[in-house]
């Protein structure tokens, strides 16, 4: 069977779900302990310590341990309308543009500046060059900074997971 480590290793190791969600080293240790106990055929290499990333993103589509729910409560998706019925035509016309400019700004503050992103696909490089002025928008620049911070935090988590896989 394939072991998919989420919160059970935290319980086994005696750490809170919040600790598991925010401290990748503790979660790696907990996952290692669970792997030795269960001896699965395979396992998911992803270590679920996304708290710092979700904080940096300003993620709004879920609660997680220590943020919206208790320290020993699993994450909970928030039932909200992220795509309204009158937006389906926009989505069908330009799925990528809709995702970047409409959907993502609704689920994370780091993407709010993307609402003002230009439409980059063009057959003319002149239109593309002119559209680059949108990147001077302070909101879009702030979004880029938040995303860089989020990316750095995710790289740390993936690095810790990669070291664990290499053991």
Sequence positions of predicted segments:
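Catalytic cores of TIM-barrel enzymes
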Residues: 1-167
């Amino acid at each position: 069977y394939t072991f998919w480590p989420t919160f059970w290793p935290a319980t086994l190791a005696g750490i809170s779900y919040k600790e598991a969600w925010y401290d990748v080293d503790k979660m790696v240790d907990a996952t290692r302990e669970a792997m030795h106990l269960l001896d699965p055929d395979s396992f998911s290499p992803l270590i679920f310590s996304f708290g710092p990333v979700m904080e940096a993103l300003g993620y709004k589509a879920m609660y997680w341990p220590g943020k919206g729910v208790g320290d020993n409560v699993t994450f909970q998706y928030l039932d909200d309308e992220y795509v309204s019925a009158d937006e389906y035509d926009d989505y069908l016309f330009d799925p990528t543009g809709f995702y970047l400019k409409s959907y993502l700004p609704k689920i994370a503050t780091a993407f709010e500046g993307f609402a003002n992103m230009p439409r980059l696909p063009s057959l003319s490089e002149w239109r593309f060059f002119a559209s680059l002025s949108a990147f001077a928008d302070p909101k879009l620049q702030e979004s880029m900074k938040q995303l860089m911070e989020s990316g750095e935090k995710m790289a740390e988590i993936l690095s810790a997971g990669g070291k664990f896989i290499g053991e």
